[in-house]
Amino acid sequence: MSINAPKFKFLGLTAIALIAGLLYTQIDYGQDAMQSTKITEPVIENKDNTNPAGYEKVTLPLSDVENIDGQIEDYLLDMWPIMSEQEVQAIIGSKDISKKLVNDTLGHVEFSLTINVPSHYLDPAPKMLWELNIPEFTSRIYQIYNNDTILITVWPNVVGAPGTKTYTGLYNIFKLRNWPTWKDPESDPLEPGTPPGPGNPLGLFAAHYDENSLRYFHGTNKNGLLKNEYRALSHGCVRNDNGNIDKMKRFIVKRMITSQDISWWANSKKSMVYNFTEEEKENFPVRIKYKTFDIGSDSYGDYIIFFKDVYGYARGNKWSKFDREELMTFSTVENITAEYKAIHKPNQFQLPDDKLIPIVESLISDHKDYEKYYFADLVAGTQSETGK
């Protein structure tokens, strides 16, 4: 026994050292894995890289492997709250999950999750454009990135009624109000205003853009009005669905405010005001236009849609001194054909004037507002009528 004791002692020490080494290795891998989840690795186009240009590969931590899509969605909407559902699903579709056996003896496995994210979403100081078309009652939110204008999301609005118009113009977001109070400007000055909360006409958040008039973007206490086809109903401000204005609030306080950290506003119900710095103003321009038609394309093809001339400007009604005439475009043959040709270049499918102009003239005289008319159907109808 005494002869073999050192041997067993040696083996015991060796086993302890081996286990300690394995534990150390496991911890070391774990630390590396934690660090790797905080890094975004730029995608470089080469023959060995299948990622498309303009994307970055982002590595995310995996809290569990049961709800991976939900974890990706939470990450994306925390990073970019106004990201569209379509974009979220497209990024989720790029996910790549791999596993690595860290330790054979203990069977420890690490999972790695990567997604391909369009590079513009990772811009640390994004520049945005909020565009509203009054007769369409619709906002389009764009990001200005590398001299390109990228559509981020689209949502409905309520705009000023004909007696209390929303003005056209070029502006910048300059002030935020969280849980604002509201007082009817036409009410008795001695009457108290409406306190903050769900019953407030401004909703839960307001973003001011016009320093010359009491007009701004805000939420609403009448979300149902946003489902109406005709939505020129406000006192001049631009109402937004409460869900959409909350997304915008979260985006602004997390991504647009760079002079200080007010990200904690995202979940706050306190009444607060923040004034933009000059640089922050420049990074969030606003364009409000008055255009009574649009030419677009969807899965069914190219179309034209007309919008009601809600303020009668196309019929000669006078606009305000605050309005900008250059931001008004009416449904004339000249305007429609010019936009059609700008979109459909000569080397693409383009209707010749002898087909396009009669179609446009007919539509101007007889159409239903807010209904899409597809050019392929219009051409087929014209050919049927003429026997061609």
Provide a role label for each language-model segment.
Residues 2-14:
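N-terminal Sec-pathway targeting helices
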Residues 19-238, 242-388:
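N-terminal pre-domains immediately preceding structured catalytic cores
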